[in-house]
A protein has these predicted regions:
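Hard-cation-handling environments
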Residues: 2-74
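Active-site-adjacent helix-turn-beta-strand microarchitecture at beta-sheet edges
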Residues: 1-17, 110-118, 122-125
Length: 184
């Protein structure tokens, strides 16, 4: 009871903002697996639209509450899905080869056959593109069949694509916090 009272007291000055309703779910929204969940798709769709990008990259997290169909999406819900200290959104140009390298590197952190080389985490979430993954293959051969979902065209290694994402570890990332962008 004391802890519940303390939490209520701390949240009280922020209640109007955190209880603000942003929308309502049509389906189950979650972030629970090693690969994309439906909340990841929502975040990636917002990145694609608001940053006018072909491909979206979002960090692989498995936190935040799962919402049932018909539940309200509040600002607090969104904050729980995007709660990190480096939330800024970027928009940049990347080659198909570099995008594949990112996916391969993260996949190796997860699926390396040597458990001492597995660094944990989750697969980077993607929007606007599809790919196949074979976790039994060695690094460099796990990711294949990369395609742009809007057109169905194959992602070419030498071609440049417009990519939006967030949670960059690069210093000086300029752009709005992801929670502001998704709230639109």
């Amino acid at each position: 009871p004391d802890m519940a009272a303390l939490i209520k007291e701390i949240r009280a000055p922020h209640a109007a903002e955190i209880d603000r309703v942003l929308g309502r779910t049509d389906s189950l929204l979650y972030r629970r697996g090693n690969l994309n969940g439906t909340f990841d798709d929502l975040i990636c769709d917002a990145l694609l639209k608001e940053r006018d990008a072909q491909i979206a990259l979002s960090p692989g997290f498995r936190w935040g509450a799962t919402l049932l169909p018909g539940d309200q999406i509040t600002a607090d819900t969104l904050y729980t899905q995007t709660a990190i200290t480096y939330p800024n959104v970027y928009r940049s140009e990347m080659t198909g080869a570099f995008i594949k390298e990112i996916l391969e590197d993260v996949a190796d952190n997860l699926f390396n056959p040597d458990p001492y080389l597995q660094q944990g985490g989750d697969m980077v979430r993607v929007g606007g593109m599809g790919y196949a993954i074979d976790i039994g293959q060695p690094i460099g051969k796990r990711i294949s069949e990369m395609t742009l979902l809007a057109s169905g065209e194959k992602i070419e290694p030498a071609k440049t694509y417009t990519v939006a994402g967030w949670a960059s570890v690069n210093e000086g990332t300029e752009g709005p916090p992801v929670y502001e962008l998704v709230a639109k």
